[in-house]
Amino acid sequence: MKRVSQMTALAMALGLACASSWAAELAKPLTLDQLQQQNGKAIDTRPSAFYNGWPQTLNGPSGHELAALNLSASWLDKMSTEQLNAWIKQHNLKTDAPVALYGNDKDVDAVKTRLQKAGLTHISILSDALSEPSRLQKLPHFEQLVYPQWLHDLQQGKEVTAKPAGDWKVIEAAWGAPKLYLISHIPGADYIDTNEVESEPLWNKVSDEQLKAMLAKHGIRHDTTVILYGRDVYAAARVAQIMLYAGVKDVRLLDGGWQTWSDAGLPVERGTPPKVKAEPDFGVKIPAQPQLMLDMEQARGLLHRQDASLVSIRSWPEFIGTTSGYSYIKPKGEIAGARWGHAGSDSTHMEDFHNPDGTMRSADDITAMWKAWNIKPEQQVSFYCGTGWRASETFMYARAMGWKNVSVYDGGWYEWSSDPKNPVATGERGPDSSK
């Protein structure tokens, strides 16, 4: 009898384990209303471009479900178990709380499998996902962050969403000679050396006359759509932000830069930059948008205000003064009264703003990160870093998010620290330090 009872108990235990597994596999689909009633969370498994607002088909729905998180299946091979667990913790997902996935079957299955391995037990399908366009959320200006297939389709002459209104150009931006460009670049792309838009001693933007000459050289008018990309996104963003300051109306970034194009397996070419017909008539006075670039006194005027934020886009070690972040910048510290807007692990990384594939993190994540330091969309906000690259990338993201009164303090820490009379802060501190 004892042997029988042991076998029975084992069978029951195995049955319960299987039932638990099947429950996870076959959780009943939920509508968005049902999910919200259970205080659950929706997870969008599509690439971030579609989450942000790009329709997957020409006339398809645009955006993501209300309060949905984005965990793209395409990121999973770039996320370790520890990174996924950190993502789950950051978004406050409980192992026994319901989550509902949506996307194509393959992506949903891949994300479900990883979440199950991470310990989530109540995973279902969002049965009415993307069925009501009126309730979908999206970046106000998602079109300013293009994705590889969209750009390829544009180059092929296909109909695309948010098509440029007139002439358009694709340009790679990087510092120095086009070494990597020569080996492989997006077909038809021009090349801009960042030395054409900024110069020593402080690496501030060049004069307006020099900007005019640079734009003419590359055949750019104020009404030319310019699509920029870089091996480093912030190099392209630096050029993009300066072009907007000059007056180019429609400037876009390839979200994630060159790496996303390469990962997509799209065509490339090699060789020198193409010959470009000069365009001497920019069409408007430069700068057409001077408010996008602040000088030191204008930046100083934003400090210690509740209706404004001067925002440091530097790593935490830079912010607290343990490193300057640059071999050529000796002073350490931060502008006293500046608010920390996050950046990355050091002066050459921007992980705090990137998904695992290098694309922009969700607007909800970025907004929450900034809100903790009293950086809000209704304020006048100016970003700075060491010399302008990281600040420019952040500016482009804020612009896509619909923040209306944003700019870059061009001189940044390099300029500020060069004047010993300017107040400097060091050491560990929190948001209250900027009041």
Swiss-Prot record:
Major localization listed first in the record, in broad terms: periplasm
Catalysed reaction, written as an equation: thiosulfate + hydrogen cyanide = thiocyanate + sulfite + 2 H(+)
The Rhodanese domain extends over: 36-138, 164-270, 304-425
Q: What class of enzyme is it?
A: transferase
The keyword Repeat appears for this protein: yes
Q: What EC number(s) does this enzyme carry?
A: 2.8.1.1
User: Does Cytoplasm appear among the keywords?
Assistant: no
Q: Where is the active site?
A: 385 (cysteine persulfide intermediate)
UniProt GO MF annotations: sulfurtransferase activity; thiosulfate-cyanide sulfurtransferase activity
Q: Where in the cell is it found?
A: Periplasm
Q: Specify which residues bind substrate according to the UniProt entry for this protein.
A: 390
Highest rank taxon of the organism: Bacteria
Q: Which Gene3D superfamilies match?
A: Rhodanese-like domain
Q: Which PROSITE patterns match?
A: PROKAR_LIPOPROTEIN, RHODANESE_1, RHODANESE_2, RHODANESE_3
Pfam families per record? Rhodanese
The protein here is known as: Thiosulfate sulfurtransferase YnjE
